[in-house]
Amino acid sequence: MREILHVQAGQCGNQIGGKFWEVVSDEHGIDPKGNYVGTSRVQLERVNVYYNEASGGRYVPRAVLMDLEPGTMDSLRTGPHGQLFRPDNFIFGQNGAGNNWAKGHYTEGAELIDSVLDVVRKEAENCACLQGFQICHSLGGGTGSGMGTLLISKIKEEYPDRMMLTFSVFPSPKVSDTVVEPYNATLSVHQLVENGDECMVLDNEALYDICFRTLKLTNPSFGDLNRLISTTMSGATCCLRFPGQLNSDLRKLAVNLIPFPRLHFFMVGFAPLTSSSSQQYRALTIPELTQQMWDARNMMCAADPRHGRYLTASAMFRGKMSTKEVDEQMINVQNKNSSYFVEWIPNNVKSSVCDIPPTGLTMSSTFMGNSTSIQEMFRRVSEQFTVMFRRKAFLHWYTGEGMDEMEFTEAESNMNDLVSEYQQYQDAVADDNDEDYEDEAMEN
């Protein structure tokens, strides 16, 4: 029941996805060959959220892996967890998308998309009650952004009532991979606004900062960053997979976090994050988790929540703890920082508690916030987009694949609309609406 189908697209998506399956397999006591080696009955109780039980008692991830070039997938397949996945679920092209959104969305990706959809259908038919899809991809490249958004829109067409959750890695302000990132990201956001239900915004720079500052890693690798992301991903769905006192699922999350359908871009955070050297000196308490979880330096995207206001937020705690104390801490945060929450949505922080902590910790918490300050990310990408688009720089790569300049203009204005919507709700005050109603009543 309540299965989630996982899709990973492009190099970034596949690398995050690979780590994610390591984390989840570890939690459920499943070894790299797919056999159960755990110790607790709880691990198997709802293992079918992410795994399908195959013949011989093997557990196979409900995962679809796609890319437009074979490289990343080959390294996944030959890696330690390569034999976990179903071989038919690896779908790849040969040419690559060359960091070109148009290739991923219209030409190369469009040729491959039908075979991806076949596998998605096959996996969806294996589910008793599919809850939704989770998609890992980056927005700066070609495959994850172009083909990833193409897949999202196709899945939305076929399964309009299932939740669509994305973990999207945005281009970072300082760490740039390719020059056309702003184009790819803007075109992708244009799609995500329309077709995504919940979008977790991540970016490499913020993750690097967490690794340097908090985890005290001198030379963090992508593996370290991906482990951070995957712990957060597993925290987002722990309530579906383990028993808890206050449960939450993808739909409850959406209902509680999204006040207006277009504003579904969330900041995520995770606590506790401690450097390995100071781990042994630290006792975990709920107040400490709460404090770190709401800390601006703990957010996994380069936007500062202190520059905006929270429309809504959700905290998912894991471990043995009292729900009363959790609620007290949440109320405490809201009372102390009331100026950072919009006052026209009362009780806008949802908390849930799951009894089983992640491997190696006694308790942890995952944070998701719908903050208006996320507009900083979009604003930054939009400025870079405009600088290039004004000069029509590199446009021929996209028009050569059959795209129209009009699409760029549309995507740009959609993103700017999104920024101004966030700004509008940041500035809104509670009593505005009453006056409007009175004016209307008088006119009538």
Curated annotation (Swiss-Prot):
GO terms for molecular function: GTP binding; GTPase activity; metal ion binding; structural constituent of cytoskeleton. One of its GO terms (biological process) is microtubule cytoskeleton organization. Keywords: Cytoplasm, Cytoskeleton, GTP-binding, Magnesium, Metal-binding, Microtubule, Nucleotide-binding. Its cofactor is Mg(2+). The keyword GTP-binding applies. Pfam families: Tubulin, Tubulin_C. Its main location: cytoplasm. GTP binds at residues 11, 69, 138, 142-144, 204, 226. CDD domains: beta_tubulin. It is found in: Cytoplasm, Cytoskeleton. It comes from the Eukaryota. PROSITE patterns: TUBULIN (PS00227), TUBULIN_B_AUTOREG (PS00228). Dimer of alpha and beta chains. A typical microtubule is a hollow water-filled tube with an outer diameter of 25 nm and an inner diameter of 15 nM. Alpha-beta heterodimers associate head-to-tail to form protofilaments running lengthwise along the microtubule wall with the beta-tubulin subunit facing the microtubule plus end conferring a structural polarity. Microtubules usually have 13 protofilaments but different protofilament numbers can be found in some organisms and specialized cells. Belongs to the tubulin family. This is Tubulin beta-7 chain.
